[in-house]
Design a protein with these regions (language model features):
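Extracellular and organelle-lumenal recognition/adhesion modules and their flexible linkers in secreted
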Residues: 24-244
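N-terminal carbohydrate-binding accessory modules
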Residues: 267-321
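Catalytic domains of carbohydrate-active enzymes, especially glycoside hydrolases
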Residues: 307-342, 346-351, 444
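Active-site clefts of carbohydrate-active enzymes
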Residues: 358-362, 467-504, 528-531
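Active-site groove signature of glycoside hydrolases
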Residues: 377-407, 428-450, 520-522
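Aromatic/acidic polysaccharide-binding cleft in carbohydrate-active enzymes
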Residues: 492-550
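Carbohydrate-binding surface patches
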Residues: 577-620, 649
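C-terminal beta-strand-rich structural cap/linker in extracellular carbohydrate-active enzymes
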Residues: 637-661
Length: 661
């Protein structure tokens, strides 16, 4: 959250650079990107600039023309732009060269964005690159959009400086081109850290099948060494890029496994590999992820249920420990083992943050000037705390851009070498780019904060997209919104536009995340409750969080059960209300088996009541909702047909008792 550069509307679709060169040069979509063409005294294709911006000769990268910004008014916010022609379903890379001089303020600096609206002019989203501030020579700022949504009708590109920033900036060589990703982005496995001793492992390739690639009649092949050491090759359909093999059939020890995308004529169109290790027995670890995506902490399944913190002190820990939560993620991680000891004594685990230890980034400590400084700091920190029983995981990255992908990947790898006993958790708002971030984390979370600009259903949309992006290879600890955006606004007028989630919204968003695959929740945030914006009472908000958390905490034994693993407990779901978009369907379901009983979680993330009818795998004699409900009891319309009526935003966890045989 803390690295967010814009408000919610701007954040929803902000993405960084994918660091993958497009195959072949694509058509330039910006007209007069260097600002050099002038006609009738006006800069061709660009709108007229307002005060504090100007087009000037001789100040560009090569002594050519450039767009200049000079501002001493913290209230000024305007920027030039031009329309660009983008296509739905495509991604676009965009860039600008910027230079800054004493550019200061809370914003991200001099940057570039693309925004889109629908046919009626309603803002739908955009892509926003991380900017440059301070005093820096010419720097290329760039990013890649998400897939352009079908509803988007008009697009504009803007070189700009964020509101409230003072100083000087220069812009040159604006560019927008269609982004064509590489056919093969990576190869991943369902084994935690690509290490296994038994059972099966599935390998999944991240492929991008453009029409041009499909036209080549491509297929996939996986090459590995079997238990005898012989090389084996297994084929797969390019539309289903996965292979499941017995771990016992793999060569003992470490090997390089390769996936290739091969055209009909034998040409290799793309390839990726991973280092996989078969062992006789899994190593002892304090905290790790099992084959079911569950956290195993000191040998026992664990469902992280916590909140973000700012500073840890014993008084706050005493207060927090009275609630239902079992962990915390403090931005200001404990510097002493005494504080970690105190958390442990109170039954609380700590997700330890090292997310700021990247030189040159906004929140980097003053002493972190080089990557060598980073490694030294991280090494000392890990050595100090890796054996502490309160340590749950390391927090590696809070919304860093994809321009840092090599550094983020190297950080995860470093943490594994220094502490193989704990996973690395990353949280992103770039929820539709999770697949590209896969090498950078062991556990992923995304943080949909929709209230009050967007519906609570956003929690389902983001979690579904996040789960899809992991290729089923990494677990989710999601970050639901418990705070009021007003806590981050400055003026009373700005604060008045926002409110906190209601208890019903918070409850729904948490259960939506779980229903869509989350095996942990860390609410944002505990410390924001005490800012009390718009006259809120902290204890009232805290009580709401506790009630929601307590309801989830009571069901953790069910949520961690794997008795029904591999079974399709819910075969089909029908709703009374038609759903236009699969991505935004209001109903989410997930099921478990615990002590012979089946539990079906069904959540209505929408704003209208829903009747839900589910076809079940087995036959049952009794159905009971174990959560508090205002919509009556669930109904068995037949041994294998369950009907549940749900109020707006309502979850139900239905316990189904099997027919006795």
């Amino acid at each position: 959250m803390r690295n967010k550069l814009f408000d919610y509307c701007c954040l929803s679709f902000a993405f960084g650079w994918l660091l993958l060169s497009s195959p072949g040069a694509q058509k330039e979509l910006v007209v007069n990107g260097g600002f050099n063409e002038v006609k009738d005294g006006k800069t061709v294709a660009w709108n007229e600039v307002k005060a504090h911006y100007a087009y000037r000769d001789g100040v560009g990268r090569s002594g050519t023309r450039a767009l200049c910004f000079e501002n001493d008014d913290p209230k000024f916010y305007s920027f030039p732009g031009q329309p660009v022609d983008l296509k739905a379903g495509c991604c676009y890379e965009y860039e600008v060269w910027v230079k800054t001089e004493h550019l200061t303020g809370d914003g991200s600096g001099a940057s570039i964005c693309i925004e889109w609206v629908d046919a009626k002019g309603k803002w739908l989203g955009g892509a926003y690159a991380e900017g440059v501030k301070g005093t820096k020579d010419w720097t290329c700022v760039k990013g890649v959009t998400q897939e352009i949504p079908a509803a988007a009708a008009k697009f504009r590109v803007h070189p700009y400086v964020r509101k409230g920033m003072l100083g000087k900036a220069w812009f040159d060589d604006v560019s927008v081109r269609e982004y064509i990703p590489q056919p093969m982005e990576g190869l991943y496995s369902t084994a935690y850290r690509n290490l296994a001793a038994d059972a099966e492992v599935t390998f999944r390739a991240a492929v991008n099948l453009s029409p041009a690639i499909r036209a080549k009649g491509v297929s996939l092949r996986l090459t590995y060494k079997d238990a005898s050491g012989a090389r084996r090759t297994v084929a797969a359909d390019a539309e289903r890029p996965e292979w499941t093999v017995s771990v016992a059939s793999l060569k003992m020890g470490r090997q390089n496994i390769v996936a290739e995308l091969v055209a009909k004529d034998g040409t290799v169109e793309g390839a990726a590999d991973l280092a996989f290790t078969r062992v006789e027995k899994l190593p002892a670890r304090a905290s790790w992820i099992d084959a079911h995506g569950r956290t195993i902490l000191h040998g026992q399944p664990f469902f992280p249920l916590g909140m973000y913190w700012s500073v840890v002190d014993t008084n706050k820990v005493d207060h927090y420990a009275q609630g239902p939560f079992n962990c915390l993620m403090p931005y200001n991680a404990p510097k002493s083992r005494d504080l970690m000891d105190y958390c442990q004594a109170k039954g609380l685990k700590v997700i330890y943050s090292v997310k700021d230890i990247y030189s040159g980034t906004r929140w980097a400590p003053r002493g972190i000037k080089t990557e060598a400084d980073e490694v030294r700091f991280i090494t000392d920190c890990v050595a100090k705390f890796k054996d502490h029983p309160a340590l749950l995981a390391w927090y590696l990255n809070d919304e860093m851009p994809l321009s840092m992908l090599p550094r983020l990947t190297a950080r995860r790898d470093l943490m594994e070498r220094l502490d193989p006993g704990h996973p690395g958790w990353v949280v992103l708002y770039q929820y539709s780019q999770i697949r590209t971030y896969l090498p950078t984390f062991d556990v992923i979370g995304t943080d949909p904060y929709p209230i009050s600009a967007k519906p609570a259903l956003t929690a389902s949309v983001w979690t579904r997209s996040t789960q899809k992006g992991t290729l089923g290879c990494k677990p989710l600890w999601q970050v639901p919104q418990a705070f009021n955006w007003a806590a981050y606004k400055k003026t009373p007028e700005e604060k008045a536009k926002y409110r906190a989630p209601t208890e019903a919204e918070l409850r729904s968003m948490c259960w939506q995340c779980i229903a869509n695959g989350a095996n942990g929740l860390v609410l944002y945030s505990y410390f924001d409750l005490f800012k009390q914006p718009n006259g809120e009472r902290a204890e009232t908000r805290w009580a709401e969080c506790c009630r929601v958390g307590a309801e989830i905490q009571a069901q953790i034994p069910v949520l961690l059960s794997v008795e029904g693993a591999g079974r399709t407990l819910v075969r089909a779901v029908e709703t009374a209300e038609p759903v236009e978009s699969t991505a935004e369907k209001p109903i989410s379901t997930r099921a478990w088996v615990k002590e012979g009983k089946t539990y079906v979680l069904v959540v209505n993330g929408g704003e209208t009541a829903q009747g839900v009818r589910m076809s079940l795998e087995d036959g049952y004699s009794k159905a009971t909702n174990v959560l508090a409900s205002t919509s009556g009891t669930p109904i068995l319309e037949g041994p294998s047909v369950l009907r549940v009526n749900l109020a707006p935003l309502e979850p139900a966890l239905v316990c189904l008792e099997p027919i006795l045989k």
